[in-house]
Amino acid sequence: VDRHGPRPHIDDRATTPEDFATLHARFNFSIDVAASAENAKLPRFYTIEDDGLAQDWTGERVYCNPPYSSIEPWVEKAHGGGAEFVVLLLPANRTEQGWWQRWVEPFRRAGTLEVEFLPGRMRFLKPGQPVVKPNERPPFGCCLVILRAPHTGVHAPPAQPRLEDVISDIEGKAA
């Protein structure tokens, strides 16, 4: 949970049916691990009461639009949950934050996950709202973070080279 605590007005927003249909046609998800009964996009889903973080994701084709006030546990679980693959829909404007630097960037550099920045700004449904109002978009773009087996069983970021080694390599190539 972020420094402000849970934020239901943000955390309970749902992917629009149109955007989800595009993703589902591409990935054929088997479960939505961060849903509510009102916004679930698949027949199989976990709600906050089910605690998707505590569930076994082994062999699943996971869709996850996590609560944006608590992203890190979901990204960490994606690495260690044993799923066939996990697609996380995340805000693209938080690449400086610790969770991104711990759980996305090192794996992206190592080539063990994909980051796909989505064009424009997605729309999200508020609880009880059947359609998104015109010009109602979040103030940020989104991205997909995609992890595929066998990298969904990795529990720690790959080792980073020591700064001294990088400098030595650069100096050696310049000589």
Predicted regions, residues:
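Class I S-adenosyl-L-methionine-dependent methyltransferase catalytic core
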Residues: 1-175
